[in-house]
Amino acid sequence: MAHAITRAFADERRAAIMEMLEHNASVQVAEIAQTFGVSSVTARADLDALAEAGKLRRTHGGAVSLHKRLTVSTQDRRINVNVAAKQAIAQSAIELVNDGDTLLVDSGTTALEFVRLLDQRDGITVITADITIADYIDESMPSVDVVMLGGALRKGHRYLYGPLTMQALQMVHADLAVMCPGAFVSSCGFTTDFPQMAETKTAMIAAAHQSVALMDASKVNGRGMYRFAELTDVDTIVMDRDPDHAVATSIAEATDSARPALIIAGA
């Protein structure tokens, strides 16, 4: 009888946790413990059970909703496009990150998928101009530190740019810059559509010891007016696939010492 009552209380509590996630993008263990008057161990067990049931995704110190959408920079209104490819790219890219790294993280939906995995590492600091990414880390990743670059807000796009952003980038240094091109054009390099974003991306690469470009196959020979980097300016490129071997061919044509590594996710 006591076991049945305990189970009923647990079911009610877990239903209430799911209601919390309906109103917020994330929930923390400490918040659950305080709200329901249970221990942290019990709160974690509730989240683990809900995760095993496929109702939420566990993070370090809490959980996030599988259904509630975050507001993402509208420079790329494709949060629900090529999701599997972006997640595969992120999973491969996380292998380039070591415990204790400082990362410069670009704006974009693939960058957000990458950031979602940072709780797999310890002692990470993220430097970014993307407000959505900073919000996500603040709400869902208590173990990850975040530094916001200053600047002017590009309205409707949720990222910062301009002279203050550029000045801030001259004052920081990262182990890895994680870049998300708007497009890759074989004869040009990595591009974006907004000139001030191009200069920000260029400065991010310059401020890091190494850099990686994350892009799904749709970006190959796509459209982009402003180049922010040549192929050889990055150290690694991570893709879900390389259409017509366009990127591999461009790499083969580069000088040996300057060739970036190409990683095909899942290959």
Could you say what each language-model-derived stretch is?
Residues 109-112:
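Gly/Ser/Thr-rich loops at beta-strand to alpha-helix junctions
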Residues 2-30, 37, 52, 85, ...:
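Conserved phosphate- and dinucleotide-binding cores of soluble alpha/beta proteins
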Residues 2-104, 115-123, 138-143:
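HTH-adjacent hinge/linker in prokaryotic transcriptional regulators
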